Each structure stands twice: as structure tokens, then as C-alpha cells.
UniProtKB/Swiss-Prot annotation:
Name of the coding gene: minE
Pfam families: MinE
Sequence similarity: Belongs to the MinE family.
A biological process from GO: regulation of division septum assembly
Keyword Cell cycle in record: yes
Coiled-coil stretches: none
Highest taxon of the lineage: Bacteria
Name of the protein described by the UniProt record: Cell division topological specificity factor
Length: 90
């Protein structure tokens, strides 16, 4: 009765609710980033491609045609996932 009166039970409920919400957020982020649990989102794939281009440009000259022809494939299997990147350059 006193716990109810002073709201002591609410703290446990709030903690449980916060924990549940945090678990949902973490699971959502894992699904977005982990290829085996879901496909990589097109936004994440585009961002990955842009970053790869910037790194490759540090070492190799790429023309606009080379950049346009970059091919990224994501393959999933039961054991692992792979990202294959093909970058044509002269």
C-alpha cells in the first residue's frame, strides 16, 4: 500500500519500459546494419558506395564513367554475408 502511495512500483515499471524500448531500438539498428538479418537498406548501400569511392580516389584516378560503372553486390548465406565491390579503372 505504501509503495503504491509513494509511487515505488512505478520506478520498476518505468525501468522495464525503458529497457524494452532500448531493446527495440538496438534490434532495429542491428537489422539495418547486419546483412544476414535483413537486406542492407538502399540508403546505407549508397552511403557505403560514396565512402568507398572517396577512399579509392585517394590512390587511383577514377573517371565519371568508372564511378558510374561501380557495381556493389550483397550476398547472404547461412554462414556469412559478403559485399562484393567491382571498380573499373584504367
Amino acid at each position: 500500500m505504501l509503495a503504491k502511495l509513494f509511487g515505488l512500483g512505478k520506478k520498476q515499471q518505468s525501468a522495464s519500459l525503458a529497457k524494452e524500448r532500448l531493446q527495440i531500438i538496438v534490434a532495429h539498428q542491428r537489422n539495418e546494419l547486419h546483412p544476414r538479418s535483413s537486406k542492407i537498406s538502399s540508403h546505407l548501400l549508397a552511403e557505403l558506395k560514396d565512402e568507398i569511392i572517396e577512399v579509392v580516389k585517394k590512390y587511383v584516378a577514377l573517371s565519371e564513367d568508372n564511378i558510374r560503372d561501380i557495381d556493389i553486390k550483397v550476398e547472404d548465406s547461412s554462414k556469412n554475408s559478403t559485399i562484393e565491390v567491382n571498380i573499373p579503372f584504367n
